[in-house]
C-alpha cells in the first residue's frame, strides 16, 4: 500500500497521478485516509501525554509510600486507575482508526512511474520493440484443434472432471509441460535466479501483502481461511516478509514453477476454447527483491530474461509498455510480452513484468539496512517467465504444418531428438 505520510504531504500530486488510472477518481478516498491519519496522530498525542503522567505518578507513589504519606499515595493510585481507563479507551479508538486507514488504503493502487504513457485502455499501450514475423509455416488451424489431433490435450475430460476452463494433458502433452518447465527453470537459474518449490496454498496475509486482496477477492479460490495461489509471485514475494535484509544481499532473485488458480471473474465469453484462459494453469514465475535505486534497471533485465525464453523457442513476439489506464494494481511500471498467434492473427500476452516499487514491501515489511545503517523498504518486481500453457498454444500454432508439429530445436532432446510429433 501507499505511505499515508507521503499521501498527506503530497495529496494533490498523489490525486493527480492516481486519477490517471482507468480514469477513476480516488480523491475522496485519499482525503478520507488523510483525515483519519490526522485523527490517529491526535489520539497518539493524547495517549502519550496520559502515559507520561501515569509514569510520573508511579514514581511518586513509591516515594509517598516510603515517606508514609498514605493519603496522598491513595489519591495518586486512584488517578493512575483513571489514567489506565482513559488509555485503554484511546487504544481502542486508535485501533479503530488504524483499521479505517488500512481498509481505505488497501483499495488504492500504487503510484505509476512518472515516465509511463498516459492512456485509457490496452489500446493505448506503446509498442517498444518486436521481432520479425517469421513463423515456420503459415496456416489457420487453432491450437486447440492441433492439441486434440495430436492427443496432447483432452479438453472434454477436463470439463468432465472439473468443469469449464480445465483441461488434461495426456501422454506427450504431459511430457511437453515437464520439458518446457525444465528448460525455463534451467535458463533462469543460469541468469542467477534461485529455484524455489513453494506451497500452492497461502495465508490471507500473504495475499494482502502482494495486493491480490481485498480488491480481487472474487478472482481467488479460497480454501477455508487460506487461498490457492493465483501466481507464485505471492509466496516468492512473501519469503522475506517481516525481515530486515542487508544491502549486500540485494538483489535477491527467485524463480518457481507452479500450478496457478484463478476464477477468471469477469471473463465470461472470452477465450472459452483452448488454453489461453484457464482456471488452473502452469507458469514459471520470476521475482526480484532489490535496492530502490536499482529497481528500474532490474525491471529492464527482468524483461530481457523473459524475452530470452521466447527467443529460445524462436517465436515471434513484441514488447509493449502498459499505459496508465492498463497498468496493474500493485505496479508502478509494467512491460507485457505478447507472442504471435497466427490463427488469431494477433499478439497475445504471455508475460507481464512489473516493478511494484515499495508498494508490496510496505505491506509485508520487507526492509534492508543500507551502508549508513538506515532501515529502508526494498522494491519488489515480478514477471512471468513464462505462462507455459500459452507457450504451448503458440508453439502449436507457429510450428504446425498442417499434418505434424515440427519441434523447436530446444525441445528435440526431450523427445528422443525427433524432428516432429504427429
UniProtKB/Swiss-Prot annotation:
It catalyses: tRNA(Ser) + L-serine + ATP = L-seryl-tRNA(Ser) + AMP + diphosphate + H(+); tRNA(Sec) + L-serine + ATP = L-seryl-tRNA(Sec) + AMP + diphosphate + H(+). L-serine binds at residues 231-233, 285, 384. Disulfide bonds: none annotated. Pfam families: Seryl_tRNA_N, tRNA-synt_2b. It is found in: Cytoplasm. Pathway: Aminoacyl-tRNA biosynthesis; selenocysteinyl-tRNA(Sec) biosynthesis; L-seryl-tRNA(Sec) from L-serine and tRNA(Sec): step 1/1. ATP binds at residues 262-264, 349-352. GO terms for molecular function: ATP binding; serine-tRNA ligase activity. It comes from the Bacteria. One of its GO terms (biological process) is selenocysteine biosynthetic process. GO terms for cellular component: cytoplasm. Its EC number is 6.1.1.11. Its main location: cytoplasm. Keywords: Aminoacyl-tRNA synthetase, ATP-binding, Cytoplasm, Ligase, Nucleotide-binding, Protein biosynthesis. Coiled coil: none annotated. Belongs to the class-II aminoacyl-tRNA synthetase family. Type-1 seryl-tRNA synthetase subfamily. Homodimer. The tRNA molecule binds across the dimer. HAMAP family: Ser_tRNA_synth_type1. Catalyzes the attachment of serine to tRNA(Ser). Is also able to aminoacylate tRNA(Sec) with serine, to form the misacylated tRNA L-seryl-tRNA(Sec), which will be further converted into selenocysteinyl-tRNA(Sec). Consists of two distinct domains, a catalytic core and a N-terminal extension that is involved in tRNA binding. This is Serine--tRNA ligase. It comes from Mycoplasma mycoides subsp. mycoides SC (strain CCUG 32753 / NCTC 10114 / PG1).
Amino acid at each position: 500500500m501507499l505511505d499515508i505520510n507521503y499521501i498527506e504531504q503530497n495529496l494533490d500530486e498523489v490525486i493527480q497521478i492516481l486519477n490517471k488510472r482507468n480514469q477513476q477518481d480516488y480523491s475522496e478516498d485519499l482525503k478520507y485516509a488523510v483525515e483519519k491519519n490526522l485523527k490517529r496522530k491526535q489520539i497518539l498525542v493524547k495517549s502519550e501525554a496520559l502515559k507520561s503522567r501515569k509514569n510520573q505518578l508511579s514514581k511518586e507513589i513509591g516515594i509517598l509510600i516510603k515517606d508514609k504519606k498514605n493519603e496522598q499515595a491513595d489519591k495518586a493510585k486512584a488517578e493512575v486507575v483513571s489514567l489506565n481507563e482513559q488509555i485503554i479507551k484511546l487504544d481502542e479508538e486508535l485501533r479503530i482508526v488504524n483499521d479505517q486507514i488500512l481498509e481505505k488504503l488497501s483499495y488504492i493502487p500504487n503510484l505509476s512511474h512518472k515516465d509511463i504513457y498516459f492512456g485509457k485502455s490496452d489500446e493505448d499501450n506503446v509498442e517498444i520493440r518486436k521481432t520479425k514475423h517469421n513463423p515456420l509455416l503459415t496456416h489457420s488451424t487453432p491450437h486447440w484443434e492441433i492439441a486434440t489431433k495430436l492427443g496432447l490435450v483432452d479438453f472434454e475430460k477436463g470439463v468432465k472432471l472439473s468443469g469449464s476452463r480445465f483441461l488434461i494433458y495426456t501422454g506427450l502433452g504431459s511430457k511437453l509441460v515437464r520439458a518446457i518447465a525444465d528448460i525455463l527453470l534451467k535458463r533462469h537459474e543460469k541468469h542467477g535466479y534461485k529455484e524455489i518449490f513453494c506451497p500452492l496454498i497461502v495465508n490471507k496475509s500473504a495475499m494482502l501483502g502482494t495486493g491480490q486482496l481485498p480488491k480481487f477477492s472474487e478472482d481467488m479460490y479460497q480454501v477455508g481461511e487460506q487461498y490457492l495461489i493465483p501466481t507464485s509471485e505471492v509466496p516468492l514475494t512473501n519469503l522475506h516478509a517481516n525481515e530486515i535484509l542487508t544491502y549486500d544481499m540485494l538483489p535477491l532473485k527467485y524463480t518457481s514453477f507452479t500450478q496457478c488458480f484463478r476464477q477468471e471473474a469477469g471473463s465470461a465469453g472470452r477465450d472459452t476454447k483452448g488454453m489461453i484462459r484457464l482456471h488452473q494453469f502452469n507458469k514459471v514465475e520470476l521475482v526480484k527483491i532489490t535496492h530502490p535505486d536499482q529497481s528500474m534497471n532490474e525491471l529492464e533485465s527482468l524483461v530481457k530474461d523473459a524475452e530470452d525464453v521466447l527467443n529460445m523457442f524462436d517465436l515471434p513476439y513484441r514488447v509493449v509498455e502498459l499505459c496508465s489506464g492498463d497498468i496493474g494494481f500493485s505496479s508502478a511500471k509494467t512491460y507485457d510480452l505478447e507472442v504471435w498467434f497466427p490463427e488469431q492473427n494477433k499478439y497475445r500476452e504471455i508475460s507481464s513484468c512489473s516493478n511494484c516499487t515499495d508498494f508490496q514491501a510496505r505491506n509485508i515489511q520487507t526492509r534492508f539496512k543500507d551502508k549508513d545503517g538506515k532501515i529502508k523498504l526494498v522494491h519488489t518486481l515480478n514477471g512471468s517467465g513464462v505462462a507455459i500453457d500459452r507457450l504451448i498454444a503458440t508453439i502449436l500454432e507457429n510450428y504446425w504444418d498442417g499434418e505434424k508439429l515440427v519441434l523447436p530445436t530446444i525441445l528435440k532432446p526431450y523427445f528422443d531428438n525427433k524432428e516432429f510429433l504427429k
